[in-house]
Design a protein with these regions (language model features):
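Binding/recognition "hotspot" determinant
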Residues: 1-70
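Alpha-helical transmembrane segments and their helix-start/interface "positive-inside/aromatic belt" motifs
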Residues: 2, 7-18, 92-114, 218-227
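Non-cytosolic segments of integral membrane proteins
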Residues: 14, 18, 22, 29, ...
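Alpha-helical membrane-interface segments at transmembrane helix boundaries
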Residues: 55-64, 95, 99-102, 156, ...
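Juxtamembrane "helix exit" motif at the C-terminal ends of alpha-helical transmembrane segments
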Residues: 68, 72-84, 235-250
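Hydrophobic transmembrane alpha-helix segments characteristic of membrane transport
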Residues: 70-108, 201-215
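Alpha-helical transmembrane segments
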Residues: 206-223, 251, 283-284
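Alpha-helical transmembrane segments of multi-pass membrane proteins
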Residues: 224-236
Length: 288
């Protein structure tokens, strides 16, 4: 009798531990996936206004003067090219000065409006993400009740050994889930920090855009901006695929162990694809 009571007490202890571990694991996943969908669609100004203002002040007060010096050198070099390219001054035409003045005007206009151009790129990307959010994903959350059903009733019929094995599985997978949630955090916050770093030095590559020889620097910078902006769209697609996959877990039988490991596998896949979105976006836009 006493042994039976101890066994029942131990079974209840294991069942409570399993339910607690699974609930915490799925709540953690739901929170992190929700953060992905919520934060990748933000513009740099909306994500953190303090960092945004600091980066903007640095760009306008420190980087723009440097870009002005570079622009002066680039346009002087451009003028020399325009003059000597016509058969070493033998076919000299005065119209090249008007051409040079026009190119200089455009270059100055681009450099002085770099911040507006950069923010316009991210505004367009944010608009694309916002419009796609309702189509790609409606709910990426995992319903714990749908995954395990009436878990406590099911586990009551299990033996102590089976419960102990499931408890160890839930502890291990829960620990792995915490590690994966950190990986998700690194992807999302790392991308935003990269956005701020890239936008801070925008005037310098834009200062070279008008010149034929150096213009590839500015063009590659613009492609990098587009890649960073539309990386958010690729991330949303990853989350949408993840949402469809976990729906299969929610309706897949009564195999609790399979549901746990399936959830972990899909989360590992999500982290892997999130890390790949940066390189994929750059390759699509030809940035390097």
């Amino acid at each position: 009798m006493i042994l039976d009571m101890i066994q029942e007490w131990f079974k209840e202890l294991l069942i409570d531990g399993i339910i607690s571990n699974l609930t915490e694991m799925f709540d953690t996943l739901n929170t992190k996936v929700g953060e992905i969908a919520g934060e990748v669609g933000m513009t740099p100004a909306a994500w953190n206004s303090s960092i945004f203002n600091m980066i903007r002040n640095l760009s306008e007060t420190v980087i723009v003067p440097i870009a002005g010096i570079i622009l002066t050198f680039v346009m002087c070099y451009e003028l020399i090219q325009l003059i000597i390219e016509k058969n070493n001054l033998h076919d000299f035409d005065t119209w090249i000065f008007f051409k040079w003045i026009f190119k200089t005007f455009c270059a100055v206009l681009i450099v002085t409006n770099t911040w507006n151009i950069v923010m316009a790129v991210f505004d367009v990307a944010q608009n694309v993400v916002s419009q796609s959010a309702g189509v790609i994903i409606s709910d990426a959350g995992i319903d714990i009740s749908g995954v395990v059903g009436n878990l406590e009733t099911q586990l009551a019929d299990w033996s102590v050994g089976a419960l102990l094995g499931l408890w160890f599985q839930s502890v291990f997978v829960g620990l792995c889930t915490q590690i994966l949630s950190i990986c998700i955090f690194l992807v999302i916050y790392g991308r935003m920090i990269e956005v701020y770093l890239v936008t801070s030095i925008g005037p310098i590559p834009f200062a070279t855009m008008i010149n034929r020889e150096w213009g590839s620097t500015g063009q590659n910078y613009l492609r990098s901006l587009l890649a960073l902006g539309f990386q958010a769209f690729l991330i949303m697609i990853c989350v949408g695929i993840y949402a469809v996959l976990v729906e299969g877990i929610s309706t897949s039988g009564d195999n609790i162990s399979a549901a746990i490991w399936g959830c972990m596998g899909y989360t590992v896949l999500l982290c892997y694809t999130l890390f790949k979105t940066g390189s994929l976006a750059k390759s699509l836009f030809g940035a390097h």
